Amino acid sequence: MFTFFTILSLCFKSWEQIITMEASKEAHHLPNYMKDDNVSQETKNLITSLPSDKDFMGYGLYNYKGCWYYPNTLQAVLDVQKHFKPRDTDIILASLPKGGTTWLKSLIFAVVHREKYRGTPQTHPLLLQNPHDLVPFLEVELYANSQIPDLAKYSSPMIFSTHMHLQALREATTKACKTVYVCRGIKDTFVSGWHYRNMLHRTKMDQATFELMFDAYCRGVLLYGPYWEHVLSYWKGSLEAKENVLFMKYEEIIEEPRVQVKRLAEFLECPFTKEEEESGSVEEILKLCSLRNLSNLEVNKNGTTRIGVDSQVFFRKGEVGDWKNHLTPQMAKTFDEIIDYRLGDSGLIFQ
C-alpha cells in the first residue's frame, strides 16, 4: 500500500524530457492565454517573486496565491480582480478546463433565455454560434490582452465564464452574484485535457508526454491547478452560501439530466412552470444542448471562436469513464489515492 508521499515521489520524471520539449515547443500552435507577450511591468516584477515551475510541455507556470498561471493568464486574472464589477443579476459559470464548461455554457444560456427564443427555435443562437461565443470567458477573452471591456453595454442578466478559483473570483464579485460551478472527476478531466491539448497544439503527442502530463497533474502543476484546491474552493463556497454558489457534478448531469437542469433553473431563479414541464420544455433544452447535437452543427465543426481556438476542439466524446481507455491501472489508483487524501473529510465524494 503506497503512502501519499510515496505516490508523489513516483510522479517526478526526469526534467530532460521537458528540456527536450522546450527545444521544439515553438512549433506548437499557442492560444494567447498561454503566452507571455501581454504582461505589464508591474506584473513582470510580481512574477519574479513567485514560485515557478513548468507544465508538461515546458511552458512556464507561476504560482499566485496557491494557483498556477501562465503569464498572460495571470495578467488577465489581476485585471479581472481590479476592474470586473458584475451586477447582482449577472451569472458566472466557473469550472476547470475540460470540466464540463462547454456543455454547461449551452445549458445555462438555454435555460435563462428560453422564453426569448421559444417562438423561433430554428434561429436559436446555439444553432448559429459556439457556446463559448455566447458565454464569454472573463480572463481568457474579455480581460485578455490588457483589455478593459465596457460591461454596461450587455443586457441583464449577462452570463460570464471563468476558470478562476472561488477565492480569486471573490476579489472581484459580490456574494449576491450567482455562481454555478461544474466539476468532473479528475481522471476524465485529465484525459479530456490531454486530447484537448493535442487538438489545441495541432499535434499528436507521444506516451512519454502523456506521462509527463500525468506527473504534473499529480503534483498539481497545471493551469488553474491544483485540481483539488480548485474543486474544494467551490465546494466549501457552496456549503457556506448555498443561495449564491451551486455545485454541480458532470457525472450527475449525465446520469439524471432532467433533474439537474430543473435544479439549475431553480437556482438561477427561473424555475420551469408546470405548463413548461408538461409541454416538454426541459426535454427540448436537453435535446438542443446535447453534445451530439452541438458537435454536429456546422458552426462547431468548422468555425473558430473569438478566442482564436477552433470550435471543434471543444467537442469530443463527453463520456463518463473514458479514462479507462487511456490510464493504466496504476495511474488510476494513484489518482484515486491522491483525491482521497486531498479531499479528506470535506464531504465531497466522486463515484
UniProtKB/Swiss-Prot annotation:
Q: Where is the active site?
A: H163
Query: What phenotype is described for loss of this gene?
Result: No effect on sensitivity to salicylic acid.
Q: Which Gene3D superfamilies match?
A: P-loop containing nucleotide triphosphate hydrolases
Q: What general EC class does the enzyme of this chain belong to?
A: transferase
Among the GO molecular function terms of this UniProt record, one is: sulfotransferase activity
Spell out the Pfam families in the cross-references.
Sulfotransfer_1
What GO cellular-component annotations does this UniProt entry give? cytoplasm
List residues traversing the bilayer: none
- List UniProt keywords, sorted A-Z: Cytoplasm, Transferase
| Known EC number | 2.8.2.-
Source domain of life is Eukaryota
The residues the entry assigns to the signal sequence are none
Amino acids binding 3'-phosphoadenylyl sulfate: K98, G99, G100, T101, T102, W103, R184, S192, Y250, R316, K317, G318
Q: Which InterPro entries match?
A: P-loop_NTPase (IPR027417), Sulfotransferase_dom (IPR000863)
Q: Where in the cell is it found?
A: Cytoplasm
This molecule's function is given as:
Sulfotransferase that utilizes 3'-phospho-5'-adenylyl sulfate (PAPS) as sulfonate donor.
What protein family is recorded? Belongs to the sulfotransferase 1 family.
Q: What protein name is recorded for this chain?
A: Cytosolic sulfotransferase 11
Q: Which gene encodes it?
A: SOT11
